[in-house]
Design a protein with these regions (language model features):
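Conserved beta-strand-loop-alpha-helix junction that forms the acyl-donor binding cleft
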Residues: 109, 132-146
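Short acidic/glycine-enriched loop/turn segments that link adjacent beta-strands
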Residues: 95, 141-142, 162-165
Length: 189
């Protein structure tokens, strides 16, 4: 079952994101107490309060606000039904949404919760228009996520140094044509 994410969910989101970062599924910096991680989680708090995240536009360098609807996942069965065990955050793009961040608590993996949560996320209004998913290429859970995305109609269309970019097969043709300009440039190092 999904519930809209709110600022009260920040502790569980922070925990799941830090765990995912330590496994290589998200930027590893997010697993640290760095200035960048503090800024990210401050922006995430704002997004959970307002629905918007502040970030730098990769094309112009300007700061911009981006719609970031999100959900937490509670299992329909089991002892953890009273607390979220997973989450999904979408980020608005020019033509729809990117499934931006998603994860399931490690203790609950391997029991179908990732598939159930992804199905529920993709049935939400932003999920129905979530045409892009970027997956860290070398995370310990990346192969499982890539397999899961394939089963939901996504295909690998581009790889950067750090990410595999998956595009849903029913994405607007214009999005596929503009994909390279939309993908943020990755710095070396």
């Amino acid at each position: 079952m999904l519930q809209p994410a709110h600022v009260g969910h920040l502790p569980i989101l922070r925990s799941l994101i830090r765990d995912g970062a330590s496994r290589g599924s998200f930027d590893r910096e997010l697993a640290t107490d760095s200035r960048e991680a503090a800024l990210f989680f401050s922006n995430l708090r704002q997004a959970l309060n307002t629905g918007y995240f502040v970030e730098e536009d990769p094309r112009t360098g300007d700061l911009t606000t981006v719609a970031v609807p999100g959900y937490v996942y509670l299992p329909d069965v089991g002892g953890g039904a009273n607390k979220p065990i997973g989450f999904g955050l979408f980020k608005a793009i020019d033509l729809g949404f990117e499934l931006w961040l998603t994860g399931v608590d490690a203790e609950w993996r391997g029991h179908g919760h990732g598939r159930a949560m992804l199905a529920a996320l993709l049935a939400t209004p932003p999920g129905k228009r979530a045409y892009i998913v970027r997956v860290h290429r070398f995370g310990s859970d990346s192969p499982a996520m890539a397999h899961l995305l394939t089963s939901f109609g996504y295909m690998l269309v581009h790889e950067t140094r750090h990410h595999a970019v998956h595009l849903r097969t029913d994405a607007p043709p214009e999005l596929g044509r503009r994909l390279r300009e939309w993908i943020p440039k990755e710095t070396t190092g």
